[in-house]
């Protein structure tokens, strides 16, 4: 008669090692699928600002449309302003925002500081940030049109430093 044996369940000390092997295998599989080359850009991003929900985001190329989350390199003056005011921890950073308006859409700030896209109210525009420092302003009372090849970035929070202050990118 053969003796039955019970399958060995990994101990709590062995589990991190097994997870490490699993993650390494998944990485190698993905790396091989990419032709053995690492991607030229970050694929996984972590957002720690309140302009969008805090957490990890996967960056993949796609044909973007209004409302989609996108990453982009902000213009140098916007990046310098963000760093100088403590919005970003590094002088070189990628922004993560939603596409609030696309080529041909209109946007503007009325005389009362309300921001609109295609005539729809989006939220208020502040003159100062939460620390009382002045924010850049787009001209009030003027209707702007998003140029071809550009978009207007908007965060989910009304306190997001985004296209309400910087215009299109």
What do the PLM-derived regions correspond to, one by one?
Residues 68-70, 105, 150, 156:
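Structural motif
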Residues 55, 112-113, 149:
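Beta-strand-connecting loop/turn residues
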Residues 1-94, 145, 164-169:
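Protein maturation boundaries and topogenic segments
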Residues 100, 116-127, 132-169:
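Beta-strand-rich cores of mature extracytoplasmic or soluble domains
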Residues 90-124:
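Mid-length scaffold segments of soluble, non-membrane domains
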Residues 75, 112, 156-157:
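Short, surface-exposed secondary-structure boundary micro-motifs
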Residues 74, 103, 129:
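Residues that line or immediately flank small-molecule/substrate-binding pockets and catalytic motifs
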């Amino acid at each position: 008669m053969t003796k039955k044996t019970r399958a060995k369940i990994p101990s709590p000390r062995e589990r991190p090692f097994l997870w490490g092997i699993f993650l390494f295998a998944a990485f190698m599989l993905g790396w091989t699928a990419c032709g053995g080359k690492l991607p030229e850009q970050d694929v996984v991003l972590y957002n720690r600002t309140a302009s969008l929900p805090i957490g990890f985001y996967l960056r993949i190329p796609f044909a973007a449309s209004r409302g989609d989350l996108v990453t982009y390199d902000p213009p140098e003056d916007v990046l310098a302003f963000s760093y100088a005011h403590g919005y970003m921890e590094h002088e070189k950073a990628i922004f993560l925002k939603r596409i609030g308006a696309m080529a041909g859409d209109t946007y503007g700030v009325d005389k009362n500081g309300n921001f609109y896209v295609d005539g729809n109210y989006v939220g208020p525009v502040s003159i100062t940030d939460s620390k009382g420092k002045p924010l850049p302003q787009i001209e009030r009372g003027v209707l702007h049109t998003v140029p071809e090849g550009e978009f207007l970035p908007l965060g989910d929070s009304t306190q997001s430093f985004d296209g309400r202050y910087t215009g299109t990118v």
